[in-house]
Amino acid sequence: MNRIFKVLWNAATGTFVVTSETAKSRGKKNGRRKLAVSALIGLSSIMVSADALANAGNDTGDGVTPTGTQTGGKGWIAIGTDATANTYTNVDGASAAMGYKASAMGKWSTAIGSYSQSTGDSSLALGVKSVSAGDRAIAMGASSSASGSYSMAMGVYANSSGAKSVALGYKSVASGATSSALGYQATASGDDSAAFGNGAKAIGTNSVALGSGSVAQEDNSVAVGNSTTQRQITYVAKGDINSTSTDAVTGAQIYSLSQSVADRLGGGASVNSDGTVNAPLYEVGTGIYNNVGSALSALNTSITNTEASVAGLAEDALLWDESISAFSASHTGNASKITNLAAGTLAADSTDAVNGSQLFDTNEKVDKNTADIATNTGSINQNTADITANTDSINQNTTDIAANTTSINQNTTDIATNTTNINSLSDSVTTLTDDALLWDAASGAFSAKHNGSDSKITNLAAGTLAADSTDAVNGSQLFDTNEKVDQNTADITTNTNSINQNTTDIATNTTNINNLSDSITTLTDDALLWDAASGAFSANHNGSASKITNLAAGTLAADSTDAVNGSQLFATNENVSQNTADITTNTNSINQNTTDIATNTTSINNLSDSITTLTDDALLWDAASGTFSASRSGSASKITNLAAGTLAADSTDAVNGSQLYETNQKVDQNTSAIADINTSITNLSSDNLSWNETTSSFSASHGSSTTNKITNVAAGELSEESTDAVNGSQLFETNEKVDQNTTDIAANTTNITQNSTAIENLNTSVSDINTSITGLTDNALLWDEDTGAFSANHGGSTSKITNVAAGALSEDSTDAVNGSQLYETNQKVDQNTSAIADINTSITNLGTDALSWDDEEGAFSASHGTSGTNKITNVAAGEIASDSTDAVNGSQLYETNMLISQYNESISQLAGDTSETYITENGTGVKYIRTNDNGLEGQDAYATGNGATAVGYDAVASGAGSLALGQNSSSSIEGSIALGSGSTSNRAITTGIRETSATSDGVVIGYNTTDRELLGALSLGTDGESYRQITNVADGSEAQDAVTVRQLQNAIGAVTTTPTKYYHANSTEEDSLAVGTDSLAMGAKTIVNADAGIGIGLNTLVMADAINGIAIGSNARANHANSIAMGNGSQTTRGAQTDYTAYNMDTPQNSVGEFSVGSEDGQRQITNVAAGSADTDAVNVGQLKVTDAQVSRNTQSITNLNTQVSNLDTRVTNIENGIGDIVTTGSTKYFKTNTDGADANAQGADSVAIGSGSIAAAENSVALGTNSVADEANTVSVGSSTQQRRITNVAAGVNNTDAVNVAQLKASEAGSVRYETNADGSVNYSVLNLGDGSGGTTRIGNVSAAVNDTDAVNYAQLKRSVEEANTYTDQKMGEMNSKIKGVENKMSGGIASAMAMAGLPQAYAPGANMTSIAGGTFNGESAVAIGVSMVSESGGWVYKLQGTSNSQGDYSAAIGAGFQW
C-alpha cells in the first residue's frame, strides 16, 4: 500500500496491466450464472499450493523435471531442457534449476536461466550463463559470476570472486576479499577495497576509489581521480593540527601556513591568490636579494670590508667609550678641547653640548649666587653648603680645564705630525672634512666649526659631573644647573625675610559661676529653664515631667512659632498616621543627638547643681525635636493659661483648647452636612441617571429593571460655571480630597535639624544664660502647682506662646501645635464647607436638568421644561453587540445607513444584468453564475442535507456536507461530491482493510481505507451508465495525489524483477526510479536520471546531466558528470573543470569530476585518512602538523637570522657613526687604500662612503668598497645594482645576534620543508618539496581527524565514512532486494498464471463443451489453470470461463464470450 499503482491481470486484453492501487477488477454478473458457478466449483476442486506440480513432468513425489534431470534424492526442481538439479537427504535443502541446461548442483542452490549454474551451497545464479560458485553467493545478470563465498555479482558480466565481495554493474569486478565494486566496469581487486563509479579501480588493500575513472593503487588509500585526471575534494572540514592528527587539511589551512611563512620571512613576502609565496626582497647596500641566505652573504661581505676599512679610523674621531658609556675627547691618550662649538640649546630635555661662553655665564651667575648666599648664611646654611660644593666643583673643573690645556698643547704637536700624512689624502677627504667633528691642531681641540661658523653638537649624552671629569656637558645639564642656581636665589630671598613666630596663646573661658548660685536657688525650683543635657527648655519639676497649663492658643499660620496645646489638633491628629513613621525616624535622630550631648556634659558639670531644680519645672527647648518640650518626668504635660493664639496663615502662636474645640465643632457640622448630602443623593439616585463606576458611564438602571434605554452619559463638567449634574464618583472624589487635606497636614511636618550647631555654641549659650537668668523668673513659662501644669500666665493675664515650631501631628503626640497648623486645618474645613454648599446647589440643579426617569413612559425622558422633545448631545458611541443596551449616537446610525447603501450597490453588482432579455439569453442567476433553464420545467436546486450545497438545474444534494454541481447531479452520501451533469455520488466509502480475493462474482481487489480520514467520494458519472475522463491532470507529487498516464508509464518502465541478496530496504516511502541507461537506483524516493548513474539512499537524486555520477546518502545530489556526492545532504557544485588554477600550482589543472562530502551550507570532516604518499593522495592533519612543526622550526631559524641581521645592522650603525667622524679615504695606521679612482662621496646626512667611487647618497647609509652605492636610508651597501660582492670568511654565528654563514643556513635548510627552486635559482613558491630532492616521495603521516569545515581528512575518517556508506548501502540494498524479490515473485507468479491460462485449449465444434487444464512457469514461479468452454449449437457463439492459482498463493479468474461467422 505504499505505491500508487499495482499490476493486475486484464482479462479483456489477456495481459497484465498497471492500474491504480484502489482499482477493482470485479465485473458485472451475466445471465450465464450456471456456467460460472460450475466452473468455479471445478476450479476450487483442483486448486493447489505453492509446491504444486508444473506441466506434465514426472510425479513420483520425489521432484519435478519437465524434461530435466536430477542427481538423486528428493525435493529438487529441474525445469527446462537438460536442466540439472542436485538435492539433499532433507527435503528442505533441495535445489532448483530452471532454464535450458540450467544447473543447480550446490545444496539448497538455485539456478534460473539458460546455462545458469549454481554450484555453491545456498547460492543463486539468475540470468543467462550466470554462475554462482561460492557458498551462499549470488550471481544476477547475464554471464555474471559470483565465485567468492558470500559474494554477490549483479549485472551483465559482473564478477565477485573475492570472499564476501560485491560487484554491482556491467563488467564490474570484486576480486578482493570483502571488496565492493559499484558501477560500470568498476574493479575492486584489493582486500577490503571499494570502487565506486564508472571504471573506478581499487587495487590496494583497504583502498577506496571514488568516482568515474578513479584509481586507488596504494594500500589504505583513497583516490578521487587517477594519474592523469584528478578531482578536487570540496567542502572538506578543517582537520585537527596536532602531533596525533591524521585528518586531511584544507586549502585554507595550507594558505594559512603559507601566510605564516611569508610573515616570518618579511621583506615584503606575501601569499598569492593561488597560495604560493612571493619571494622576499632584502636590500643590502645597493643589492637586492630574494632570499635570506643571499642577503646575509652580501651583508657579511659588507661588514667584513667595513671592519677592515675602519680599523685605523679611531685616531682622530670623537668615538664612543664603552668603559664610561660616553663619547671620549681623548686624543693620543690625553684629554682634549672641543673648539668652535656653537652654543647648545639650554632646556630640560636638551642633549646639546655647551661651549665655554655658556659655562662662563653660568659661572658668573654662580659667583653672584655665592655672594648672595653669604649674606643669608644664618637661615640657609644647607643651601650655602650645596652651592659651595658646586663652586668647588666648578673651580675643580677650571683646574681640570687648565690641565687639559697643557695636554691639548702636547696634542697640537702630535696633530701637526698627522697633518703631514693627512695632506696627501686631502683630495679624498674634502667632503668628510666639511662635516666631521675633527681635531683642530691650531687650537689644540676638536672644532665644531662648519663652513666657517660655529655649530652645535647635538645628541651629546650627559657628561660625567665629577672633580676629575673631562667629559663635555650637554645643554640639559647646564640648564639643570642654571635652574638650581635660580631656585637657590629665590630660596635665599625667601629665607632672608624674617620668619615670625606665630604662636598665639589660647585664652580659656573659665568663668566661675558660683556667684550665681544664690540668685537661681528659687528660680531653679519653679522656672521653665533650659536643660543643657537635653538642649531644650525642660518642664521637669521635682524630678518628674510636668504639664504646661494655661497655654494660650498659639497663632496658626505657616510661619507661626507659637506654642499650641494638645487639644487644638486632637481631632485632626486622629486622622494622621503617617507621622508615626516620621516620629520613629526622628526618635533615632534624637537618640543619636542624646549620645552626642552626653559627650559634652563634662564641660558643664559645674552648672548641674544650680540648674537641677530649674530644669524640672521650666518649659525648655528640646534640641532633639527642635521644639519647646512640655514633657515632665517623662510624661506629656499641659500648658495652661494660654491665651488664644492668632489664627492666620503666618501665625506662630500656640492655640488653646477653646480654639481647637471651635474647629472640631465645625468639623462635626461638616460631617453631619455631608451625611445629609449623602442621604439626598441616595434618594435622588432612585430616579436619576447616575454614574456607574463599573462601566465608566451613566447607567439607566431603575428599580428592578437593570437595563433601560439610555446609558453611558459622560460625567458632568466640573468648573466654576458648570451646571452639569455630578455623579457619586465625583462626590466621592471630593470626600477623598477632604481625606487628602488631612494627609497634607501631616506632610507639613518639617524635618528636625541636628543640634551640632547648638552643641558647638554651648559655651556661648551658657554665657547667655548667666546674663539673662536674673529676669528669667518673671518671664519664664513656669510650673503651676495649683493646676498641675505649666502656666502661660504673665502679669496675671493669659498670654500667647509665640515662635512655637510646628508640633508633631500623630495619635500619641504631646507636642504643642502652633497657629499656622490650626489655621491650615481651619482653612481646609472652610473649603470643605464651601464645597459642600456647592454640592447642595448642584444637586438642586440636577433635579431640574437631569435626564430623569419617566414612570408614565417607563423610560428615561429627554423632556426639559415645556419642551416635550429634546436632543441628547455628546452621547458616546454605544457598544454594538447582541446583548448591548447602550444608546447609539447619530454617527453610528449614519455609518449603518452608509453600509446599507454600499450593500445595495454590492447586491446590484453581484446580481449583474437583471433584464428579462439578458436572463432569457444567458440564464437565471447572479453575475458570473447562471443557469439557462429555457424550455425546461421550472425546477430549482435542492440542498436538503445539513451543510450540503446544490448548484445547477434540478441538482440535489441530500447528503450532509455533500456537493452536487451540474444539471440533474445528485450527491446523497455524507461528504460526497457529484461533479457534472447527470453525475451521481451515492456510494459510501467503506472504512476498513480488505485483501484481494476471488469470489463468485469475480476477483475483488483489496483496499486499505483506515490510514486517513475519509471525507467522501467524488463522482464524475453514474454507476454502470456513464463516466468521464479527467484530462489535463498535472503529475501527482504526494502519496494521495492523482497520477497521470505518463507517471504510470514511467512507473511501469521502472519496475525491475531482479532479486538481490544482501540488499534490503525498510521504508514506506515511494519506490526508487532508475531512468538512465545502465543506471542503478537504490533507496526510497531515489531517482537516477543519468546514464550509468548510481543513486543509493533516501531521496537521493542523480541529475540527467550527471552521467556516471554517484549520489550516496539521504538527500544526496549528484549534479555533474563523473562526480560523487557522498553523505546526507551532500551535493556536487562544480563537477569536472578544465584549466583551473589549483592551490599552490602554477600549471593549469584538469579534473574529470568532483567528490563532495557536504554542501555549501554544511561540510564534513573526512576522518581516519591515512597519510598520503603519491602526488595526488590526500594528506591528513598529522602530515600538515609535521610540516607546520618544520615551518615553526624554520620560522624560529628565520627569526634568529632576523635577530642576527638586526644585530649586524646595529654594529654597522655603530661603525657608521664612527666613520662619520673619521676620514673615509686615505691611510692611517690600520687603514690603507690602494686606488687612484674617484673620491668617495658621502652625500646623505650621517652617511659614510668608503672606497674609490663609493657613494653614500641616502641618510644614515653606508657604502663599503669601490663603486659601492648606498642610495636608500639606513642601509649598508657593499656593491651596486650592477655589481655585487660576497661577504666571505664569515665565522659561524653563536649568539642570537651573530651573523650566520652559508654552512649554517644549509644545515638549517637540510631538515626543513622547502619550496621548489626555479632554473635561475629563485624560489618557486607554487611547489613545496617534502622530500630530499632525490625523486622519492614523502607521506604526511599522523594526520588528525578533520574537525573544521575545510579540514583535510585522514584515511581513518575516509575509511570509516566508506564503511558507513557500505553498511548503509548494504542495508538499503538488502531492504530493496526484499521488496524487489517480493515484487518479482508476485509478478513471476502472475506471469506463470497468465501463461497457464493462455495454454488452456477450448471447444471449437458447434454444440461442443470442453473442460481443460494447463500449467505454466516463469522465473521460478509456477501456476496451474483450469477452464470450461462451450460452443453454441449454431457454432456462432463461443463462451469461456477459466481460473488459475500460482505458487505465490494468488488466485485469478477470467470469463469471455465471442461471436464467429
From Swiss-Prot:
SUPFAM superfamilies: Adhesin YadA, collagen-binding domain, Pili subunits. Immunization of mice with folded, full-length, purified SadA elicits an IgG response which provides limited protection against bacterial challenge. The chain crosses the membrane at residues 1407-1417, 1421-1431, 1440-1446, 1450-1461. Residues 1373-1461 are annotated as: Translocator domain. This is Autotransporter adhesin SadA. The gene is sadA. Disruption phenotype: In vitro, loss of sadA does not affect cell aggregation, biofilm formation and adhesion to epithelial cells. Disruption does not affect the course of infection. Belongs to the autotransporter-2 (AT-2) (TC 1.B.40) family. It comes from the Bacteria. The signal peptide, cleaved at the inner membrane, guides the autotransporter protein to the periplasmic space. Then, insertion of the C-terminal translocator domain in the outer membrane forms a hydrophilic pore for the translocation of the passenger domain to the bacterial cell surface. The surface exposed region contains four YadA-like head domains and extended stalk regions, multiply segmented by FGG, HANS, DALL and neck motifs. It is found in: Cell surface; Cell outer membrane. Residues 1-54 form the signal peptide. GO terms for cellular component: cell outer membrane; cell surface. Pfam families: ESPR, YadA_anchor, YadA_head, YadA_stalk. It comes from Salmonella typhimurium (strain LT2 / SGSC1412 / ATCC 700720). Disulfide bonds: none annotated. Keywords: Cell outer membrane, Membrane, Protein transport, Signal, Transmembrane, Transmembrane beta strand, Transport. Residues 55-1372 are annotated as: Surface exposed passenger domain. Homotrimer. GO terms for biological process: protein transport. Involved in cell aggregation, biofilm formation, and adhesion to human intestinal epithelial cells. InterPro entries: Adhesin_Head_dom, Coiled_stalk_dom, ESPR, Pilin-like, Serralysin-like_metalloprot_C, YadA_C.
